[in-house]
């Protein structure tokens, strides 16, 4: 797309004031002509890290309506639609093209261009090479609250048959713990820290508490309630798990109505409904 006149100034001068961020969403500068687009992009990034791809897509799309040349919003559309169906193919390709064109322009911050590069590496070269790109990104911009979490997501390699975490798993835990020391209220970091223990042989009480903190960071997050339900189920609290999945269901329905989204695009609702049914069965109800 043709760059607007403001773009030459955007790298040096950010919008002076943006609307307040929702609970649990961390601040990061976003190059945009619209102060209102910045929190939308950051909400979208938080949704990506908490497994809410369609919600993320809606936020990034809303940001693009305010600023069609927002590089990070195009990046977000590409990220959130990676696993989407063929009905999103055209939009995914168009945003990828726009992201690549904008990332070549020196008016955009190097930080944002690095995000575009890391995504390109992921798509073209796979997760192993992408890990290197994300590591460089988070090491180069240590104040970025999101880069270490995307890196941690790629590092995850689970546990072996004896319950020992893999090297990537241990490094991911270390990274997320570092983020939480600096930003204890980060919903994305709390969610990621709990998620890292999801496939552990035994769920310790500390992990359940971390999942509860992720819910407290943003009580309107259906993903956080769903994740809490997983841990309550794993620890034998089937009634508590059912209640958590029901809360996730309700929030999914509320989101459908407020965003006018068809249920077919709300896969989180179906996941929560299925897990709640299993929890109810295990609870003997």
Q: How should each PLM-predicted stretch be described?
A:
Residues 67, 81-84, 102-106, 141, ...:
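Alpha-helical junction/boundary sensor with strong preference for TPR arrays
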């Amino acid at each position: 797309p043709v760059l607007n006149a403001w773009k030459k100034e955007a790298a040096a001068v950010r919008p002076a004031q943006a609307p307040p961020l929702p609970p649990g969403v961390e601040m990061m500068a976003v190059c945009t002509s619209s102060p209102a687009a910045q929190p939308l992009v950051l909400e979208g990034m938080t949704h990506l890290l908490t497994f809410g791809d369609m919600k993320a897509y809606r936020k990034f799309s809303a940001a693009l309506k305010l600023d069609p040349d927002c590089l990070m919003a195009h990046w977000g559309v590409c990220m959130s639609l990676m696993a989407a169906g063929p009905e999103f193919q055209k939009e995914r390709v168009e945003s990828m093209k726009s992201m690549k064109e904008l990332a070549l322009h020196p008016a955009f911050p190097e930080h944002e261009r690095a995000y575009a590069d890391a995504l390109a590496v992921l798509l073209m070269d796979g997760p192993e090479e992408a890990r290197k790109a994300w590591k460089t990104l988070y090491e180069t911009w240590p104040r970025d609250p999101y880069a270490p979490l995307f890196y941690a997501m790629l590092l995850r390699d689970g546990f072996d048959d004896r319950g020992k975490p893999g090297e990537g798993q241990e490094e991911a835990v270390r990274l997320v713990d570092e983020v939480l020391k600096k930003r204890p209220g980060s919903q994305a970091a709390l969610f990621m820290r709990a998620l890292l223990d999801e496939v552990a042989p035994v769920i310790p009480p500390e992990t359940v508490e971390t999942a509860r903190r992720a819910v407290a960071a943003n009580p309107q997050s259906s993903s956080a309630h769903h994740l809490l339900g997983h841990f309550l189920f794993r620890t034998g609290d089937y009634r508590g798990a059912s209640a958590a999945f029901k809360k996730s269901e309700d929030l999914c329905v509320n989101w459908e109505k407020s965003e006018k989204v068809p249920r077919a695009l709300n896969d989180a609702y179906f996941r929560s409904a299925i897990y709640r049914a299993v929890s109810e069965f295990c609870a003997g109800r």
